[in-house]
Amino acid sequence: METLMKMKWKIGSVEIENPFILAPMAGVTDLPFRILCKEQGAGLLCTEMVSAKAISFHNKNTISLMQIDPVEHPVSMQIFGSEPDLMAEVAKSIEEQPFDILDINMGCPVPKVVNNGEGSALLKNPELIREIVTKVSHAVKKPVTAKIRIGFEGYPVDPVEIAKIIEDSGAAAVAVHGRTRQQYYAGEADWDTIRRIKEAVSIPVIGNGDVDSPKKAEALVRETGCDGIMIGRAVRGNPWIFREMNHYFTTGELLPRPSWEEIREMILRHARMQIELKGEFTGIREMRKHIAWYTSGMRHSAGLRRDSNLVSNYEELEKLLDVTVQR
């Protein structure tokens, strides 16, 4: 296969082995899932987004989201907020923690975030973006990045200009989800805007949106020239996507999808990691959504999802998966 892009690259001084990035997703990219994705070949991991204000209040639940394991490196910590001075202070206060890159969320479409002027609401105010990125990047020595969407309904957002502002303000890279805030995750991602941003800035551009297979990753690179490929919803229940993309981009060959035995073992390993981190009660309950994702589209998956909601411990989960095999 022709070489589409460099496999090894950098964000600031941080070396990254391949361009395949786990997107930050609330309720998904916690510590256990990030480790599983790393083992399958993710080049860069991103934490769940954490509130700068909650960090400043030493909120216990927020602090727990910031836990990082040494095996994860390189890993990006994503924060969100709208107050430049507070965000800079928080960035400085957490810099000694073992993350490699600090990312600023400017794309979250969720109402409770947007209504606070945070996440994608920042797109309405380019000068506030400039102030936030400038102050945060000056406050820390680690590379600072930003993740944006390409528009906000009712406002004349110019995503290319915003990317330029982010670059000029000291960011080391920008990730672009090719959808507006109004779209959430509906419709097709606008890869052409990602291409225009890539042509307009000199920092690395990470493309995000609609990449759910090695072939789609290839298409994104061909259409945009992006430096990194960020995978979000398609990785839920599918950490193998990183293995498949690495293999395809280096050999041109498509790997077979994981067998049921591989899926079963991944579910059980994931469950053990969740239990170790959060205890059996919480760990097993948090696995329910992951089980739905792991088994989506499989025969008997509807019954398995239903039955998994009744499981309360690891032994019951193991038995349920064994029964599923025998159906």
PLM-predicted stretches and their roles:
Residues 39, 88-118, 127-203:
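Alpha/beta enzyme core
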Residues 1-8, 12, 16, 20, ...:
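Alpha/beta catalytic cores of nucleotide-metabolism and tRNA/nucleoside-modifying enzymes
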Residues 2-10, 25-100:
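Glycine-rich, positively charged N-terminal anion/phosphate-binding segment
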Residues 123:
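Aromatic- and acidic-residue-enriched carbohydrate-binding clefts of CAZyme catalytic domains
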Residues 9-21, 55-75, 108, 113-116, ...:
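N-terminal small/glycine-rich loop or linker at the start of catalytic domains
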Residues 25, 50-52, 80-82, 107-109, ...:
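Active-site beta-loop-alpha junctions enriched in small/polar residues
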Residues 20-24, 45-47, 75-79, 102, ...:
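Hydrophobic faces of well-ordered beta-strands that scaffold small-molecule active sites
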